[in-house]
Amino acid sequence: MPKRAIIPAGSGVPLAPFVPGTLADGVLYVSGTLPFDKDNNVVHVGDAAAQTRHVLEIIKSVIETAGGSMDDVTMNSIFITDWANYGAVNQVYAEYFPGEKPARFCIQCGLVKPDALIEIASIAHLGK
């Protein structure tokens, strides 16, 4: 099965050996996305809603670079550092998925940088 790396224009260099997305057989796998700028600095420190919006904009960019849209998302995996931010995360999340919602899960855990409050990984079905 051939696969293709999806790297939006202006993407920074990841902290580890991975690409923002991989397209294989019509399915786009979007790597865990953190609220980082292109230099891997955490943005919107202390603001879960703004970090969520930043992360979802990056994910949207990856999906659009692959030729899809947020409507193609079938699964989101959400990692948050504090359940107190769950409401703010959901409020922003709902703006990006106003129609039929994709499957998802959300867990509380530590993240790679202490100021990062959220990480999201996505799967989108773009067809063949």
UniProtKB/Swiss-Prot annotation:
Keywords: Hydrolase. HAMAP family: RutC. One of its GO terms (molecular function) is deaminase activity. The keyword Cell wall biogenesis/degradation does not apply. Gene3D superfamilies: RutC-like. Its EC number is 3.5.-.-. InterPro entries: RidA_CS (IPR019897), RutC (IPR019898), RutC-like_sf (IPR035959), YjgF/YER057c/UK114 (IPR006175). This is 3-aminoacrylate deaminase RutC. One of its GO terms (biological process) is uracil catabolic process. It is an enzyme of class 3 (hydrolase). Pfam families: Ribonuc_L-PSP. GO terms for cellular component: cytosol. It comes from Pantoea ananatis (strain LMG 20103). Transmembrane segments: none annotated. Involved in pyrimidine catabolism. Catalyzes the deamination of 3-aminoacrylate to malonic semialdehyde, a reaction that can also occur spontaneously. RutC may facilitate the reaction and modulate the metabolic fitness, rather than catalyzing essential functions. It catalyses: (Z)-3-aminoacrylate + H2O + H(+) = 3-oxopropanoate + NH4(+).
